[in-house]
Amino acid sequence: MDYFPMIFALLFVAFQGAPEAAVLGTELSAGAEDGGEKPAPATPWRPRRSKRCSCSSLMDKECVYFCHLDIIWVNTPEHVVPYGLGSPSRSKRSLKDFFPTKATVHRKRCQCASQTDKKCWNFCQAGKELRDQDSMEKAWNNQKRGKDCSKLGEKCLHQQLVAGRKTRRLEAISNSIKTSFRVAKLKAQLYRDKKVIYNRAH
């Protein structure tokens, strides 16, 4: 019998992994010469998310949408939610973040990563001004609601009447929605019960 083709095939398969084996052999021999110490494995590289700025509140969805550049935003019927690209590696925080001082009570909407980014700077500043304006308007509206409109005039009476109608209409709509949900739930339960009875009968 001629074993030459079979031996040749086995040698070919065995020597295909020869370069890797040679490299591994040199590493092992070098490790044995150094006293058997293995080099520490390098920490895996994790991609950092590119952030244009950091928001002072994560509840501010507009700010989060503006600042986080690589988040895919998914529209759901309820709200817009971020569809993240893995957990980002976070930088260490200073003690100032844990113990806020009195000066940091009136913070900006966000803090830009680059000081030369004018669009970001304008966005953060405009957000602060808008929030201040909204809070002033809310305070004025609350003050008007609390006061008697006889002193403020006809416009105040009209606004109170419109606001009252709106709230009553919204309450009626929410009540009808709740009722329709309850009815649908009862119908679904009745259908399930009928289906179970029908299956048991046959």
Swiss-Prot record:
Residues in the signal sequence: 1-25
Keyword line: Cleavage on pair of basic residues, Disulfide bond, Secreted, Signal, Vasoactive, Vasoconstrictor
GO molecular function: cytokine activity; endothelin A receptor binding; endothelin B receptor binding; hormone activity
Positions of the UniProt region annotated as Endothelin-like: 110-124
Record site feature (Cleavage), residues: 73-74
UniProt keyword Signal present: yes
Disulfide bonds: 53-67, 55-63
Matches recorded under InterPro entries: Endothelin, Endothelin_toxin_CS, Endothln-like_toxin
Keyword Signal: yes
Any GO BP: prostaglandin biosynthetic process
Subcellular location: Secreted
Domain of life: Eukaryota
Transmembrane segments: none
Coiled coil, from the record: none
SMART domains named among the record's database cross-references: END (SM00272)
Any one GO cellular component localisation term in the record: extracellular space
Protein function: Endothelins are endothelium-derived vasoconstrictor peptides. Probable ligand for G-protein coupled receptors EDNRA and EDNRB which activates PTK2B, BCAR1, BCAR3 and, GTPases RAP1 and RHOA cascade in glomerular mesangial cells. Also binds the DEAR/FBXW7-AS1 receptor. Promotes mesenteric arterial wall remodeling via activation of ROCK signaling and subsequent colocalization of NFATC3 with F-actin filaments. NFATC3 then translocates to the nucleus where it subsequently promotes the transcription of the smooth muscle hypertrophy and differentiation marker ACTA2.
Stated family: Belongs to the endothelin/sarafotoxin family.
Protein name stated in the entry: Endothelin-1
Source organism of this protein record: Bos taurus (Bovine)
Source organism phylogeny: Eukaryota, Metazoa, Chordata, Craniata, Vertebrata
The gene coding this protein: EDN1
